[in-house]
């Protein structure tokens, strides 16, 4: 896997007397991170700001947009108010009202979720709502691919949309 960061550094240096475990090592505006696997781009994370904490190996990001790619094309996108990126594993966790929209307009909404790039899956332990062209599913807990094609939802209630055949 590859990882690339870009952004503009904030000119303000952290206060010398501050607790350095709670003070970001760097603050980047217009943050962008690209992730690749076997030379092919798998995700791009864009955020208005990233606060990097080097000692803890993570970055907190504001208004993250996470683009997922399959075979070189965008397959879905995630949008959230807040997120955190593990800088060593590239795992992304988002919260505050998360939405994932796939290329076929399937839409997943939940309060919090996590993307694991090692297995290329999205996970959530929270209540989830999934709207597909032919159905609506609500439940607690989720495991899915970023394209929202292979989805496992716990404690689910599903409804077929009117006018759709099975």
Locate the predicted segments by residue.
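Mature-chain termini and adjacent capping regions
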Residues: 1-166
């Amino acid at each position: 896997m590859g990882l690339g960061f870009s952004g503009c550094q904030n000119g303000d240096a952290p206060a010398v007397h501050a607790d350095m475990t709670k003070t970001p090592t760097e603050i980047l505006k217009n943050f962008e991170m690209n992730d690749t696997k076997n030379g092919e781009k798998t995700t791009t994370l864009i955020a208005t700001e990233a606060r990097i904490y080097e000692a803890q190996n993570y970055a907190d990001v504001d208004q993250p947009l996470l683009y997922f790619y399959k075979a070189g094309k965008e397959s879905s996108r995630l949008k959230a108010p807040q997120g955190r990126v593990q800088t060593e594993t590239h795992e992304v966790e988002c919260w505050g009202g998360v939405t994932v929209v796939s290329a076929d307009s399937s839409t997943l909404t939940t309060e919090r979720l996590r993307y694991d790039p090692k297995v290329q899956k999205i996970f959530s332990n929270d209540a989830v709502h999934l709207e597909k062209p032919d159905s609506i599913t609500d439940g607690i807990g989720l495991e899915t691919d970023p394209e929202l094609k292979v989805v496992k939802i716990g404690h689910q209630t599903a409804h077929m949309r009117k006018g759709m055949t099975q």
